[in-house]
Amino acid sequence: MKLWQNLAAAAVLGLAATASAADAGVHAFTLNLNDGAPKKLADYKGKVLLIVNTASKCGYTKQYAPMEQLYQKYKDRGFEVLAFPANNFMGQEPGTNEEIRAFCTAKFNTTFPLFAKISVKGDDIHPLYKYLTTLPEFSGDITWNFNKFLVDPGGKVVARFGTRVDPMSEELTKKLEEILPKRQ
């Protein structure tokens, strides 16, 4: 009897944790910044986010430049780009967090938040990416570097863009403009 009670309690707690993530969206997660400091994504409540898995040795690495351009264009309207380096695809992000930061700063002069390297697929997938890739309307594994998730100010994912979608493309910026606060 005690076993069944414990199993029932565990199931309820598991559902509560899932419901909590569903209610809070991406704001339910905490990850480490590139320097190792923990960062609650709840700190970004009220802001529109573009979450991107990145790599320094990929044919799409050049997307760091339009990511920075997008960030500079919209940051004063409550927009953040969050970059998550990942080494899941052909070893294209082999560096340490320090090396990744140095590369992004020197090559692309990035100023948006850069997080510590994580896994975006497989058995060691980070819980944030597990959440992102199992949302019914945006489900599916991350298949390459520079996949993008657009998140509204409440933490809800509103769009997913593939690797080939340039951050400054009309497709992405049009959707971004729809959810950003209007200019006064």
Predicted regions span which residues?
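Bacterial N-terminal signal peptides that target proteins for export
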Residues: 1-8
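Bacterial N-terminal signal peptides
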Residues: 8-16
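N-terminal "domain-start" segment that seeds a small globular fold
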Residues: 20-42, 127
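Amphipathic alpha-helical repeat scaffolds
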Residues: 53-57
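Structural microenvironment flanking redox-active thiols in thiol-disulfide oxidoreductases
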Residues: 60-126
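Thiol-/selenol-based redox modules, centered on thioredoxin-like
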Residues: 127-184
